[in-house]
Amino acid sequence: MLLAAGCGDETGPSADEPGGDATSSSSPSTATPEPVEPIDFGTEPRMRERYKKAALRAVDDKLITMVPTVLPDGWTARGGGYTADPQWWRMEFTAPTGDVVLDQLPGTSAEALADAELTPAADAELTPADDVDLTDWGTGTWSAWDHDGATVLAHDLKGSTVVLQGPDLETVRGLAESLLPAEDAAEQDG
């Protein structure tokens, strides 16, 4: 099952069991950009190394839950988590160029980003950038922003929004190109 490969094998009775820490020791051959504090949507879901059940629980709660079909080369999934109230699906990744975060929330990207605390710094804000066309990957056009030097992509789908954050457009786009709803990924062989 593809989702199991991407989400870890779960042997415990619930998706809320603690998982081990997953780390990556690979380092890029070029200078790593200065990390940027991601957009703060509130108290984030607790991250688990094994999160397949959490993803499917979010689906059961009618939140479309996006997961990567295959991670780009050199990437690792650090974990995922889901909170039912308020609904929030989150995954964290390490890419060769830096950390990448996927947040999925009910509503639109405009609502989610308007309600978010961007950073403690008063000068940090979202600056609109050119939209990103991912029609060839089945998800259409994504809105893009610059957030204090980092890239933010957002896409609205059926009552929820996916927000991706990472160090640069190429990195964040690489994740966006691999996304598939969890319920579809669970049905695929892999």
What annotation goes with each model-predicted range?
Residues T11, G79-G80, E183:
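Generic short alpha-helical hydrophobic face used as a protein-protein interaction/packing hotspot
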Residues S14, S25-S26, E117-T127, L157, ...:
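Compositionally biased non-globular segments, especially hydrophobic aliphatic-rich helices
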Residues M1-A5:
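Sec-dependent bacterial lipoprotein signal peptides
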Residues D130-G190:
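A short, solvent-exposed beta-edge/loop patch
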Residues C7-F41:
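Short, low-complexity, disordered segments immediately C-terminal to signal peptides
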Residues G12, D16, T23-S24, A84, ...:
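Intrinsically disordered, low-complexity, compositionally biased regions/tails
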Residues E37-G149:
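Short, solvent-exposed recognition patches
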